[in-house]
Swiss-Prot record:
Family: Belongs to the universal ribosomal protein uS2 family.
Species, as recorded: Helicobacter acinonychis (strain Sheeba)
Name this polypeptide is given: Small ribosomal subunit protein uS2
InterPro entries found in the cross-reference section: Ribosomal_uS2, Ribosomal_uS2_bac/mit/plastid, Ribosomal_uS2_CS, Ribosomal_uS2_flav_dom_sf
Record-annotated membrane-spanning stretches: none
Keywords from the UniProt entry: Ribonucleoprotein, Ribosomal protein
SUPFAM superfamilies in UniProt: Ribosomal protein S2 (SSF52313)
One Pfam family linked to the record: Ribosomal_S2
Gene Ontology terms describing biological process: translation
Keyword field contains Ribosomal protein: yes
Length: 246
């Protein structure tokens, strides 16, 4: 689990310039240095560990968690961790209705699958060069926008967001559907929008990587707990059956 040393080394304590702050984050601020708000890492550590446990427990209950982060500093890191633990993600651009109009998103994913089926069967080679080029360009665009959610069959039970100020459409959709939001909370963000905030820098690459790493580990730990519970339940069932047959 995350330590104070991890937070310091990754620069999690550096907030935004004082003129860009959201006054609602006052309770998370330790002080000011060179017109930069410094986040109170004692509070960050406490919120981090609490939120880690929330995410772990959600995962242990079989709940699905989606990763969202489209800005340049975050998109590749977020994709790397999301793919490594096989959770849905959006790292290029949030399409309006990704959650609130999910059935339409599924139809777009189906278009991507149809194009891939055409490629695999060789059917695409029967088209003219111009038609083939148009379809392949469409496939590239669909994959860029929807590649991370193509295996998502239902809306997620929770979302982990990097930069709630930038991802305001995703946050608004999640709140509308009462989907809990987990997110690092920088000094320019509104804490009222996040169910499980972790006070910290959401711009520095090392900080973003730490957040993604810890949330991924929480999800994996939760899955292990769920498997242990299943094995334990099976053992109990076999024991009961053995006793009843005696």
């Amino acid at each position: 689990m995350v330590t104070m040393k991890d937070l310091l080394e990754c620069g999690v304590h550096f907030g935004h310039q004082t003129r860009r702050w959201n006054p609602k984050t006052k309770k998370f601020i330790f002080g000011v240095r060179k017109n930069i708000h410094i986040i109170d890492l004692q509070k960050t550590l406490r919120y981090f560990r609490y939120t880690y446990n929330i995410v772990r427990d959600a995962s242990a209950q079989g709940k699905s968690i989606m990763f969202v982060g489209t800005k340049k500093q975050a998109n590749e890191t977020l994709k790397e961790f999301a793919e490594s633990i096989q959770v849905p993600y959006v790292n290029y651009r949030w399409l309006g209705g990704m959650l609130t109009n999910f059935s339409t998103i599924r139809k777009s994913v189906r278009k991507l699958e149809i194009i891939e089926e055409m490629e695999n069967s060789g059917q695409i080679d029967l088209l003219t060069k111009k038609e083939k080029l148009m379809i392949l360009r469409k496939k590239e665009k669909l994959d860029k926008y929807l590649g991370g959610v193509r295996h998502m069959k239902k809306i997620p039970d929770m979302i982990f967001v990097i930069d709630v100020a930038k991802e305001k459409i995703a946050v608004a959709e999640a709140r509308k559907l009462h989907i809990p939001i987990v997110a690092p909370l920088d000094t320019n963000c509104d804490p009222d929008l996040v169910d499980y905030p972790i006070p910290g820098n959401d711009d520095a690459i090392r900080s973003i990587r730490l957040f993604c790493k810890e949330m991924s580990e929480a999800i994996l730990e939760g899955r292990e707990l769920m498997q242990e519970e299943i094995v334990h339940a099976d053992e109990n069932s076999e024991e009961i059956e053995f006793v009843s047959n005696e």
